[in-house]
């Protein structure tokens, strides 16, 4: 679940112990399996309410808590990001249609720790220009992860994402960002998707963050709807969103969430 980018000067960063990172890994595994459970249902004719109920039931059946549900009054277990919705869309009676795309952003709390991830799915056959947006956004996630190394800075992650996407003609949402994660869904530091190399907090051993590029086909400008949550592109062109929770431990970067379960469900439809 993306945070709001406030560009605060002072941030309180909580570094995790190896034992805490192990607990986060378990939460992230359940988060990953929840996303795959929803993937089984992504198809024309399915409502976003149905996807939300699938996730909620799966999380509860496996001993977790859907952390988005009730967070600041958010009404669902999962953020539903259909087409031009960038982040924080509500589950509803909306029925998926051929050619839609949908980002499913899910946060699971297990044993006091959170895992956070997002994957944008094609619904049936999708326009190739939109598919390329999705591929580029996912690739930019891994460009950011590649530079999430001890001794680097948060700005290195931001710049890697921004450079990769903008060089390919896409725009980067600036008002929303990734974030630290642990016992709380949203912790410091903020992790923007734009910025300069060599700036921002230093990446240290024990850092756990959610990296989540939100990339638009058209303009970077966004609008917050009257519900106070739903964020969409101003020009109503599609937006894509991919996210992993990562940890820095013993000088190595570990991706705690995984798309492998989703890949098993989607087969040759996996992006």
Label the model's feature ranges.
Residues 2-271:
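Active-site neighborhoods and metal-handling regions in enzymes and metal-associated proteins
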